[in-house]
Amino acid sequence: MPKDSTALLLVPTGIGAAIGGYAGDAIPVAKMISQVVGTLITHPNVLNGAGLYWPMDNTLYVEGYALDQFAKGNWHLQRVNSNRVGLLLDKGIEPDLLLRHLQVAEASRATLGLELSDYLVTDEPLEITLQTSASGASWGNITNPSSLLRGADKLINLAQAQAIAVVTRFPEEPPESIVLQNYRQGCGVDPLSGAEAVISHLIVQRFGIPAAHAPALNPLPLSQDISPKAAAEEIGYTFLPSVLVGLSRAPRYITKYQSNSISSADVDYVITPASACGGSALLSLASKGATIIAVEENHTQMRVFPESLGIKAIRVKSYLEAVGVIVSKNCGISLESLGPNISRLERL
């Protein structure tokens, strides 16, 4: 079966996706799709599972702003064997919590063989604020973005970092918070993820290198009423391991196409929640002729369907069905021929 196609798996962050709205719960979807394509491109929201991760050699870990630039044709993706990852820690993190994250960094070097530069603490607390939009999506702001960018600049220019992992102190939701309770029970929006995207976007936009974020939070009280989807966030002090692993093999972003790089013209399929079709990357790739596969059972807080934007999409119920579409098209089999009824040919 041909497997030289390229697919982009999108699950936008902070919109309450039923699959991919939690820490790493879309990894099984990525694993499955990676088996039927030559290259899978996706983003940290899909692949970050807090302390859990899954290596996939043909899967590229690309930050959201970089995905938008890639889809527009402004950037191309260059595979690498490894990146030297710089760790940028928020000055607002308490000493004990800071030490926990340094231990993760040391463990990733000793246990996984990752290459890290010396770390840096920002010169000011970054002070993150969290918000929820009227649509129910989460977002946030960073009070001191200049401190974030100064820290990243030093890691790049003084420590030769090729990718940046950021850990910032996030506000704590009280355990009795309805938002937090809903999320822990598998039926809410991640209140952190929208702000996380802002942090990584700033670095990627300014420096053009891979970046991803892990929040620093105190462990929550133990509870027996935790959804399996939220459980990855309950098992430790840190979300950093999967970020370091992802960045260690993240492709570099280049502005001049090379023969062995990947461009937006190479993307054959875009798989997205059916109700979240308004993103820049999807719109760009749809206009270039990529096959859009809209998954209906991955419900989100959004209501932006492909038909309302004039996008021709193949609607499927599940990711299992989405894989079937990819396999059949890769094999040159008409989708219509797989159904119980086939319409007659008409004379032009």
Residues covered by each model-derived region:
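Metallocofactor- and cofactor-centric catalytic cores in central/energy metabolism, strongly enriched
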Residues: 1-180, 189-193
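A short acidic (Asp/Glu
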Residues: 21, 52-55, 175-179, 222-225, ...
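Anion (oxyanion) recognition and catalysis
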Residues: 34-35, 204-205, 286
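Hydrophobic beta-strand scaffold residues
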Residues: 40, 116, 210-211, 292
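Short, hinge-like loop/turn segments at secondary-structure boundaries
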Residues: 58-61, 229-231, 311-312
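Generic multipass alpha-helical transmembrane bundles of integral membrane proteins
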Residues: 134-142, 151-152, 156, 164-167, ...
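C-terminal functional extensions of proteins
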Residues: 218-222, 239-269, 273-348
